[in-house]
Amino acid sequence: MKIYLVGGAVRDALLGLPVKDRDWVVVGSTPQEMLDAGYQQVGRDFPVFLHPQTHEEYALARTERKSGSGYTGFTCYAAPDVTLEDDLKRRDLTINALAQDDNGEIIDPYNGLGDLQNRLLRHVSPAFGEDPLRVLRVARFAARYAHLGFRIADETLALMREMTHAGELEHLTPERVWKETESALTTRNPQVFFQVLRDCGALRVLFPEIDALFGVPAPARWHPEIDTGIHTLMTLSMAAMLSPQVDVRFATLCHDLGKGLTPPELWPRHHGHGPAGVKLVEQLCQRLRVPSEIRDLARLVAEFHDLIHTFPMLNPKTIVKLFDSIDAWRKPQRVEQLALTSEADVRGRTGFESADYPQGRWLREAWEVAQSVPTKAVVEAGFKGVGIREELTRRRIAAVASWKEQRCPKPD
């Protein structure tokens, strides 16, 4: 029996990145030997065991053979005669097909070290094309390591295109697509994930609402980048700088979906694109089974981001109604989330990357003023039932009006 550290732990250690999870491969052993040594079996489809002390995963070396469609259509073979090289060959990328023995020596049968040095994401073997999930995984790795200068090898991107055009991605379940997307949204450069999907044709298959934005023009006065798809990726990049939250980043990604519905004869203007985009947000989220909290914020951002841009022109009643509409009294974090997504929208434009966004500050200030109006005072004044809410709203509007008169600049 020989045990090797494999995959991401080896890769990230070589890149000087923190190692979170450690996975191990066991060569020359059987399930019974692992059980006799005190390991606990957890794998249903192939032999994976938990170490009795560390609870890290130890998998018997195995090979995989395509036996059906999609990313689940594989038959696994695990036996003492499966070599380490056999096991590493089934992995997706050469940088993930590295192993380390107990002496610290790196085993690299597929030039993963060279690709690490050259910052290349390259597939290990043609078997890559048998698993459609790998298209998403490579896009996610490209986003995760973009800040280190990694790029996808030409032949790997070509294979990803072939897989997409062959209809392989249609076998992916919504849950797996969302899981990879959610993980990509946590990276430093989530926009790279969607750019890679577009480069290989997968964006049109998995995210047609986003793909439809490319080639749709916006007024050059407001959008020097002109193309709405490019603007969308720029805003996502900016959102990633402003917030680590997946819901903020996803909402930013979806903020302009309605522009994809504008008839070409009306281009480059997109009146009413916010409310129009709400239906597309719902459609996308229902298809991918996006969690409701993330979906709800995306709907609100699509509907209200343009309103926040015009904040100085809003009357106090409209401002308080906005807080009602986003359910800020019960979910106050939405005010900050809406401020951040709107700021990302403004700064996600060519030449505006460092622009100030005072509307975000005014939105936050108005919220502090509105929520500082005490409910207790209304009740103590003798208001009852629905009258409490009406009086509370009246006082909030009055407080915001007073603040706006003093602190918010008059519209030109």
Curated annotation (Swiss-Prot):
Self-association state and partner proteins as the record states: Monomer. Can also form homodimers and oligomers.
Gene that this polypeptide is encoded by: cca
Residues reported to bind Mg(2+): D21, D23
A Pfam family of this chain: PolyA_pol_RNAbd
Catalysed reaction, written as an equation: a tRNA precursor + 2 CTP + ATP = a tRNA with a 3' CCA end + 3 diphosphate; a tRNA with a 3' CCA end + 2 CTP + ATP = a tRNA with a 3' CCACCA end + 3 diphosphate
Cofactor binding annotation: Magnesium is required for nucleotidyltransferase activity.
Family: Belongs to the tRNA nucleotidyltransferase/poly(A) polymerase family. Bacterial CCA-adding enzyme type 1 subfamily.
Keyword tRNA-binding listed: no
Keyword Nucleotide-binding among UniProt keywords: yes
Domain of life: Bacteria
Stated name of the protein: Multifunctional CCA protein
Upper classification of the organism: Bacteria, Pseudomonadati, Pseudomonadota, Gammaproteobacteria, Enterobacterales
Enzyme Commission number: 2.7.7.72, 3.1.3.-, 3.1.4.-
Database matches in PROSITE patterns: HD
Chain sites annotated for binding CTP: G8, R11, R91, R137, R140
HAMAP family, per the entry: CCA_bact_type1, CCA_bact_type2
Note: A single active site specifically recognizes both ATP and CTP and is responsible for their addition.
Chain positions recorded as ATP binding sites: G8, R11, R91, R137, R140
